[in-house]
């Protein structure tokens, strides 16, 4: 056992390096997912029926199908559907962002509906353009209300990003799998990967609590 730990020690760093890859996908997905989610949420509360139908249909597709299937379609089927072969990174970033956008849109929609409608009516009475009402009055309050839910989405993205290993990306999970095959031991590599995921989630949760407290004070 002791000899194995000495032999396994250098491979720990190889696994931990995958943390950066996991973070890269998660951060990109949460940024673009937030943008997509905001646009969809605005469409969902819009009076235009066509926009509402489109946003609801989009959400139903990405919430109603597994992320693994979405990733597979974007990576393997895109050359046949749109004639473009995406790299593993692009396919992962697109799939995670589109999927995240669907979930974030529902969170933001709920946040928008939670804002007192009297503020919207008062702003309209002052002849403030609807775009500015949404951008400067409604969305800032909505984001403040839903901040914990957005953090939860980032946490979910960190864990769900492990499926990118299916395409051979050298993330935490893929590196742990490689070490498992090389050492004929699945316990320690997966334990190291699990610890890395746990530390990432705890760190993000800690930072989020600090930010949330400052938002409450402000």
Curated annotation (Swiss-Prot):
MF terms in GO: transmembrane transporter activity
Family membership noted in the UniProt record: Belongs to the binding-protein-dependent transport system permease family. HisMQ subfamily.
Task of the protein: Part of the binding-protein-dependent transport system for glutamine; probably responsible for the translocation of the substrate across the membrane.
PROSITE patterns listed in its UniProt record: ABC_TM1
Transmembrane annotation, as ranges: 25-45, 57-79, 86-108, 187-207
Domain ABC transmembrane type-1 residue range list: 19-208
Protein's membrane topology: Multi-pass membrane protein
Organism domain of life: Bacteria
GO terms of biological process kind: amino acid transport
NCBIfam families: HEQRo_perm_3TM
Gene source species: Rickettsia conorii (strain ATCC VR-613 / Malish 7)
Family matches, as InterPro entries: AA_ABC_transptr_permease_3TM, ArtM/GltK/GlnP/TcyL/YhdX-like, MetI-like, MetI-like_sf
Entry protein name: Putative glutamine transport system permease protein GlnP
Keywords: Amino-acid transport, Cell inner membrane, Cell membrane, Membrane, Transmembrane, Transmembrane helix, Transport
């Amino acid at each position: 056992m002791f000899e194995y730990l000495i032999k396994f020690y250098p491979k720990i760093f190889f696994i931990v390096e995958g943390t950066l890859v996991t973070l890269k996908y998660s951060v990109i997905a949460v940024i673009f997912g937030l943008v997509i989610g905001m646009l969809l949420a605005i469409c969902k509360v819009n009076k235009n029926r066509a926009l509402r139908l489109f946003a609801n249909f989009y959400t139903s597709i990405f919430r109603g199908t597994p992320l693994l299937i979405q990733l597979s379609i974007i990576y393997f089927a895109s050359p046949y559907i749109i004639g473009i072969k995406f790299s593993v990174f692009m396919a992962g970033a697109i799939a995670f962002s589109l999927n995240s956008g669907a979930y974030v849109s529902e969170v933001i929609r709920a946040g928008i509906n939670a804002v007192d409608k009297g503020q919207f009516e008062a702003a309209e009475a002052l002849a403030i353009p609807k775009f500015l009402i949404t951008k400067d009055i409604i969305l800032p309050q909505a984001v403040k209300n839903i901040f914990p839910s957005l953090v939860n989405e980032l946490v979910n993205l960190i864990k769900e990003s492990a499926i990118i290993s299916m395409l051979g990306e050298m993330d935490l999970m893929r590196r742990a799998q490689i070490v498992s095959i090389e050492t004929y031991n699945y316990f320690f590599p997966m334990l190291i990967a699990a610890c890395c995921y746990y530390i990432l989630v705890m760190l993000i949760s800690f930072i989020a609590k600090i930010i949330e407290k400052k938002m409450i004070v402000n």
